């Protein structure tokens, strides 16, 4: 399952999002794969800091603000 994952390093923490602030929006730099070097925004659950390496299942999607539907 983790064979499909792509590593990405957190370069900036943009802020909290979601109805109660449960997710953190971060900018990550993709470290390998077809999108290597690309910086994208993603929503992350749980504690995260600059320099952390996240394993992304897909690198094509950009995060949007989470809000009430």
UniProtKB/Swiss-Prot annotation:
Pfam families: Ribosomal_S28e. Keywords: Ribonucleoprotein, Ribosomal protein. One of its GO terms (cellular component) is cytosolic small ribosomal subunit. One of its GO terms (molecular function) is structural constituent of ribosome. InterPro entries: NA-bd_OB-fold, Ribosomal_eS28, Ribosomal_eS28_CS. Gene3D superfamilies: Nucleic acid-binding proteins. GO terms for biological process: maturation of SSU-rRNA; ribosomal small subunit assembly; translation. PANTHER family: 40S RIBOSOMAL PROTEIN S28, SMALL RIBOSOMAL SUBUNIT PROTEIN ES28. Belongs to the eukaryotic ribosomal protein eS28 family. This is Small ribosomal subunit protein eS28. It comes from Picrophilus torridus (strain ATCC 700027 / DSM 9790 / JCM 10055 / NBRC 100828 / KAW 2/3).
